């Protein structure tokens, strides 16, 4: 690879980086409105940066929700979650922001997010955020 080609490659965003930069939560119409059911999504590779040290924080996100009028599209939530990888944000703020954004986009009947962060310095943090009232399924 020539020096010019190498320079161009480092300046041109990769297709995955472009997709993450353009990420937004996309929802589609609930195929079974009026029926109580739950959707469970696990995102095991979440990363963001500690706002105090700048070190990366890693977590498993576990989302359980009961759809309202809309259901979140899976690729969209994957890209949306990946958009946090370079953001400096606390565990508590990122967990609440994700819930706020999901509620704004999909209007679920009930939603719970569990953000299970990898231990660092002998401290293990789990943040749980809920919205709405869970209905029996």
Swiss-Prot record:
Pathway connected to this protein: tRNA modification; tRNA-queuosine biosynthesis
Catalytically driven reaction(s): 7-aminomethyl-7-carbaguanine + 2 NADP(+) = 7-cyano-7-deazaguanine + 2 NADPH + 3 H(+)
Chief site of localization: cytoplasm
Binding site for substrate: 72-74, 91-92
EC numbers for this chain: 1.7.1.13
GO cellular component, one term: cytoplasm
GO annotation, biological process: queuosine biosynthetic process; tRNA modification
One Pfam family named in its UniProt record: QueF
Annotated compartments: Cytoplasm
EC category: oxidoreductase
UniProt GO molecular function: preQ1 synthase activity
SUPFAM superfamilies in alphabetical order: Tetrahydrobiopterin biosynthesis enzymes-like
InterPro entries with a match to the protein in the record: GTP-CH-I_C/QueF, NADPH_dep_7-cyano-7-deazaG_red, QueF, QueF_type1
Keywords from the UniProt entry: Cytoplasm, NADP, Oxidoreductase, Queuosine biosynthesis
Active site: 50, 57
Protein role: Catalyzes the NADPH-dependent reduction of 7-cyano-7-deazaguanine (preQ0) to 7-aminomethyl-7-deazaguanine (preQ1).
Protein family (similarity comment): Belongs to the GTP cyclohydrolase I family. QueF type 1 subfamily.
Name under which the protein is recorded: NADPH-dependent 7-cyano-7-deazaguanine reductase
Species whose genome carries this gene: Synechococcus sp. (strain CC9902)
Lineage: Bacteria, Bacillati, Cyanobacteriota, Cyanophyceae, Synechococcales
Gene that specifies this protein: queF
């Amino acid at each position: 690879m020539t020096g010019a080609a190498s320079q161009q490659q480092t300046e041109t965003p990769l297709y995955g980086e472009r997709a993450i930069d353009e990420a937004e939560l996309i929802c589609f119409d609930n195929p079974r409105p009026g029926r109580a059911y739950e959707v469970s999504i696990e995102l095991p590779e979440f990363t963001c940066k500690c706002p105090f040290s700048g070190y990366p924080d890693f977590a498993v996100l576990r989302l359980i929700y009961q759809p309202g009028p809309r259901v979140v599209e899976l690729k969209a939530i994957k890209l949306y979650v990946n958009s946090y990888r370079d953001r400096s944000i606390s565990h508590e703020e990122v967990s609440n922001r994700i819930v706020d954004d999901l509620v704004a986009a999909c209007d679920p009947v009930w939603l719970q997010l569990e953000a299970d962060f990898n231990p660092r310095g002998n401290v293990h943090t789990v943040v749980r955020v809920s919205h709405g009232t869970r209905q029996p399924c």
